[in-house]
Amino acid sequence: MSEALNVEKIFGEKVFTVEKMKERLTRKVFLEVKRVMDYGGELSMTTADVVAKAMKDWAVENGATHYTHWFQPLTGITAEKHDSFVSHPDAEGKMLMEFSGKELIKGEPDASSFPSGGLRATFEARGYTAWDITSPAFLIESGCGVILCIPTAFCSYTGEALDKKTPLLRSMEALSEQALRIVKLFGNKGATKVTASVGPEQEYFLVDKDLYMQRKDLMFAGRTLFGAPAPKGQEMEDHYFGVIKERVGAYMKDLNEELWKLGVTAKTQHNEVAPAQHELAPIYETANIAVDHNQLVMEAMKRVAYKHDLRCLLHEKPYAGVNGSGKHNNWSITTDNGENLLDPGDTPNKNIQFLLVLACILRAVDRHADLLRQSASDVGNDHRLGANEAPPAIISVFLGDQLEDVVRQLVETGDAAKVKQGGKLETGVSTLPDFEKDATDRNRTSPFAFTGNKFEFRMVGSADSIASPNTTLNAIVAEAFCEAADRLEKAADFDLEVHDIIKEYMTAHQRIIFNGDGYSDEWVAEAERRGLPNIKSMIEAASTITTDKAVALFEKFGIFTRVELESREEIIYETYAKTINIEALTMIDMAGKDIIPAVASYAGELANAVIAIKEAGAGAAAQTEMLLEVDGLLAEAKKALNTLKEVEAKASAIAGAKEQAFYYKDVVKVAMDALRAPIDKLEMVVDSTIWPIPTYGDLMFEV
């Protein structure tokens, strides 16, 4: 039996926690740092120098030689540049290890080398990173050694946000300010801050390293671009929550240990629906820390996989025909004195503050469904949304029977006199306990579902940063809170006004509530009748962030400027085009150099066999039939390959980012599908010893 792991002892050992700060800083300095962490403001440079020295000393004691400003540019992944603590030797030639407050607070990476949507050019490259004091520094050990990572925001020389974190932090402040107005109106005078808490459920696939290395599509695109279905997929429903394989379990064990050391509260692990698909879920944290930690989770998943001769696939759709991966974004809002604004209590019909919060959220989601849809858009997610494995591309809200009934009563009569209860679940077995049921069931097809004391936004893609969805959620809810607070603060009769607002908002926005089957065709038709947007792709959603309505929202709360939004729209088009271009070129490479030559060779063998058999006096009917089938599909594949080459060349020559992106969507992707179809059919009829790449059966079942 392996040595017992003391989780309490190792948890956070690679993190410069508040506890470690308290041990290493004077009381005066510590209190100043804690004040800025909790309430904002600036540290004096003297204090910053003291904190920097303490942080450096701790890092060096743990083997660190370098530090980095760890930030999240608009690539959606993290970025870092390593600087050593080494400084100029003293007069005696002794090397000093130094780290100043200025180096802690500010860095200067090249802003022109990251996506900026035209905000930064090569001749105006300066950008700044700024220390996010609310997210703790941590140590990462890799081939580079031990690096002190300092979470930072990233902006241009002219002040525009060039990252995912800066708008998130702005949105958190906006939400806190507006939510505080609401809770104070209801008598919570002790609250000084309201925090959005987030818990993302991270799905992923594992694949054997050697098989991965034989698939150019997995290496370059992160997903398979060719592949016939395996004889067995997920139809037996035996993988979800099934027994975890030894190799996968060993990987999960090491992953948990790595994450616990980094202060990530990894809580749940299990097999997901598709073969070789799994999930890890943490405990809730403050939104910006949850965003940082989710990036660490994804990086650790890849890093630990290497140690086990595996590769971790975070793409939303690595394999056709089986479920892809998402990232359920659980979101709640809580005051700093412990009040969860999304807790309905035992009698939600009488919980007026909760009903107002719920009404505001319904208003926010209905009014800005397009923005919420856009916040979960990426190229990979286009393969999932609306495909009977993930929420539809139509935004709706699931409340469950209890709350939907409360809303119905309020809309129809202005009052909710009664509330449905869950009752008892009786198992009928004397040795099993009976227990209280929840008041409502779960709906796995809903994109935005209330689940007891939080909302679960289920559209987010597995490879995507959760910063944008939470920025959008915070912003749209802050706006609804602001409008309600404006009215309530001026109201002559508070009780009457709050009831009027609740009924008005619920009546106006009840169309967004849907408790039924989001996968059904009937819902698509019903959503259209209700006037709900059905935005089917990433690039169709892109323009939603630059509408006058969106710009007014984000500018009102200082989250984005119009220029920042326009740059992000441009980046969306560029990202889409570049991604599809990589996929198209990979298909051209695989089909032209590997698959078609192998099939042509096999067709030659069949032709020789037909000739030999006929010369021997036999009919060769089966061989002839096989040859004709292979030859026909081969010709179809070669023609499709030529077409893909032509349209890819045309796409690459298009100048405008938006025009180019739509050409890739409407023309190049169609040509890619046309090439895949005959090649997947060929895989089913060509000798397996000749087929040049691992099959779905190999990839999903040899882990």
Model feature map: region roles:
Residues 64, 68-70, 293-307, 333, ...:
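Hydrophobic/aromatic-rich, well-ordered segments within soluble, folded domains that form packed cores
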Residues 126-314, 323-326, 333-570:
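Glycine-rich, acidic/polar active-site loops that bind/position phosphate-bearing ligands
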Residues 6-17, 36-38, 231-240:
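Gly-rich Lys/Arg/Thr-decorated short loops/hinges at beta-loop-alpha junctions or inter-strand turns
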Residues 76-92, 109-112, 215, 222-224, ...:
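Short linear, low-complexity motifs centered on an aromatic residue
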Residues 502, 507-703:
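C-terminal amphipathic alpha-helical interaction region
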Residues 2-33, 44, 126-131, 136-149, ...:
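Catalytic pocket of metal/acid-base enzymes, prominently hydrolases
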Residues 11-100, 106-123:
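Histidine/acidic residue-rich metal-binding segments in metalloenzymes
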Residues 47-51, 71-73, 102-103, 210, ...:
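Active-site-proximal loop/turn and secondary-structure-junction residues that shape catalytic pockets
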